[in-house]
Amino acid sequence: MTAVESGSKVLRMKESDAQKLLAMRCHIGTRNQSSAMKKYIYGRTAEGSHIIDLHMMWEKLILAARVIAAVENPKDVCVCSSRLYGTRAIYKFSQHVGTSFHGGRFIPGTFTNQIQKKFVQPRVLVVTDPRTDHQAIREASLVNIPVIALCDTDAPLEYVDIAIPCNNRGIKSIGMMYWLLAREVLRLRGTIVRSVPWEEKVDLFFYRDPNEAAEEKAAAAAAAPAAEAEEGFGWVERNDDNAWEA
């Protein structure tokens, strides 16, 4: 029995949360496995991909949420994602939780070079992938900043203090993990109550290709005149009983 399961019932994973994680394939890892992540693996699929234990995933997510909620100033928590698919998720997470965020390439010296223009000293660092965010993790280790990381089955855990085992390569999986993490932080702070579902849609945490969004917008704009033209040929009933008019 895990620490979360043996503790308060409030923090236990609900069936609806488990269904969300399964639907977004948060439990499907890679075909590779690092020795440090072996304890989080439940089994393998027929295709050879490793399956992550949902209970251990939830336990670490709750632990990470408690750490973030305990930081007095939310801006002292820095969320990073060098992986493109995670930029939208960390932006929405920071928007709701109030943390600082850094998307795209991490500039060397951000945590260690005090004369740098964008120098910051966060109290907690959250990263999307220990591999792509290795520079941020390395600098955090030099200045004693605790690190929370979304870790796939092949992730290295060097300098990672809290590893949340999950699929950190899928667009929907990354969005779901940050959505759940944001929700739990807000619940622990008392900003939202557990008895009422969070109104924020998880879809807003999913990365969208700018080109795809522009194409959809252009298609909608092109379809609008055609729809208006069709409406113009409708029939309107007159007040008198003699006829109909176009």
Curated annotation (Swiss-Prot):
The keyword Repeat does not apply. SUPFAM superfamilies: Ribosomal protein S2 (SSF52313). Its main location: cytoplasm. InterPro entries: Ribosomal_uS2, Ribosomal_uS2_CS, Ribosomal_uS2_euk, Ribosomal_uS2_euk/arc, Ribosomal_uS2_flav_dom_sf. It is found in: Cytoplasm. Keywords: Cytoplasm, Ribonucleoprotein, Ribosomal protein. GO terms for cellular component: cytosolic small ribosomal subunit. PROSITE patterns: RIBOSOMAL_S2_2. It comes from the Eukaryota. GO terms for biological process: ribosomal small subunit assembly; translation. The keyword Cytoplasm applies. GO terms for molecular function: structural constituent of ribosome. Component of the small ribosomal subunit. Mature ribosomes consist of a small (40S) and a large (60S) subunit. The 40S subunit contains about 33 different proteins and 1 molecule of RNA (18S). The 60S subunit contains about 49 different proteins and 3 molecules of RNA (25S, 5.8S and 5S). Interacts with ribosomal protein S21. Required for the assembly and/or stability of the 40S ribosomal subunit. Required for the processing of the 20S rRNA-precursor to mature 18S rRNA in a late step of the maturation of 40S ribosomal subunits. Belongs to the universal ribosomal protein uS2 family. HAMAP family: Ribosomal_S2_euk. This is Small ribosomal subunit protein uS2. It comes from Leishmania infantum.
